[in-house]
Amino acid sequence: MSQFFYIHPENPQARLINQAVEILQKGGVIVYPTDSGYALGCMMGDKHAMDRIVAIRKLPEGHNFTLVCSDLSELSTYARVNNTAYRLIKNNTPGRYTFILTATKELPRRLMTSKRKTIGLRVPDNKIALDLLSALGEPILSCSLMLPNEEHTTQSDPEEIRDRLEHQVDLIIHGGYLGQEPTTVVDLTEESPVILREGSGSTAPFI
């Protein structure tokens, strides 16, 4: 059975943040809040935890995960960012966007797509998520918490999440009741941005 932490959305308790980081570092799978609903997360290099997330979501083989980063500097460690992309990302992070970028060699090979060496990255506008990332010291490997047969909305009610997933994850963080619309996905691998999915972030800056 999973642990269940009530963490204040504006003033996260450092003790609980540190306990959440310990769970991640021990191979745990967590549910945590972002600015676009709840997400499943684990350590970037933990294949077993990654496989557990695949099973929970019933994801197809080769599904693209996202690296949730603390800031633009950390994002730039794992992706090649040209001047145009840098400006667009800087002007729109933290925020409700996932950016598709060409991966650097710092990224574990299994996290890249097979046809194109790309990765999705984002910097969330959520205090709990940012405190987790700061305490962890590296990105969290994540995907939106969309359960099977409910692929168009992210889970927003942590009490309902506990009812459905308490035997499948190691920690659920209650950080408030959140929106249900996933991030807007923007491909920045070419000279001009391409909107791959319209979500909770405005597409106006990229058109």
UniProtKB/Swiss-Prot annotation:
InterPro entries: DHBP_synth_RibB-like_a/b_dom (IPR017945), Sua5-like_dom (IPR006070), SUA5_domain (IPR052532). Pfam families: Sua5_yciO_yrdC. Gene3D superfamilies: DHBP synthase. Residues 14-201 form the YrdC-like domain. GO terms for molecular function: double-stranded RNA binding. PROSITE patterns: YRDC. Belongs to the SUA5 family. This is Uncharacterized protein HI_1198.
